[in-house]
Amino acid sequence: AEKQTMLEMSLTHEIGEQNLQFKPILAKLYADNKYELMWKDKAAEKQFLREYAAMVASGISKRSAQSLINLHNAEKTGGLTYDVLLSDAFLDYLYYSKNVNQQAQRWLYATNAYKPELPNQEIIDQWQSAVKNDAVSGFVNGLSNHNRLYRETVQSLPSMISASGISEMGKKLALNAQRLRVIPDFENGIFVNIPSYQLKYYRDGKAILESRVIVGKNERRTPVMYSRLSNVVVNPPWNAPTRLINEDILPKLKRDPGYAAAHNYSIL
């Protein structure tokens, strides 16, 4: 404990008091690295910040947003302080990127639901190995999702940012980008865009069929998922679920006895 306290005091001596998420581990990492910069590769820095800014813009974490503000404020000063703040934010992003696939339903469907935590030591060691071997760009690139729709969405975000901040449409787009992040890239498959009520069928990376779809109401949301399909039944027989009958169809039948016939419902 005494050694850790000394390490943290040494880091504070080097960069002053900073609002860090992961000061204990950063104090050790930078001491081990003799306080040399870890972000000498500017291409890796740019790539990381693009991904991190897209994550922050989605609104899933106020703490991550504060880290991005701290980075922006320290950018002009640069040097070791900026480098440590970059690493602090990167540990946040590292934990997020390694766990979002398992936590998507919890983190990406509620405001400020994601709480940054320290990544496991094995992942941190892999990052430090990349730093020592000048391979940070490759390491950062490996954390991203190469889903084409995700990449295109992230690339469109800067156009929605002004001096007053990101637009409401931009925030929605950023959140949808994070939801796309958990979907692997695919050349052949069916992609359903729930907010726009649209389905697209892709073959060899090209959309060859588009169709309107019916989705659930806000109080009965359509599940979000990724799955492999072994077969598709076209125009299957369908019985209305009990909840839909009770909450939607019966009230309409009470108002209009001819509703069922007008909408081709058969009462069994």
Region roles according to the model:
Residues 1-20, 31, 91-92, 111-112, ...:
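Well-ordered beta-sheet/strand-loop patches within structured domains
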Residues 1-112:
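Cationic-aromatic interfacial patches
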Residues 97-133, 206, 226:
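Structured beta-strand-rich cores of soluble
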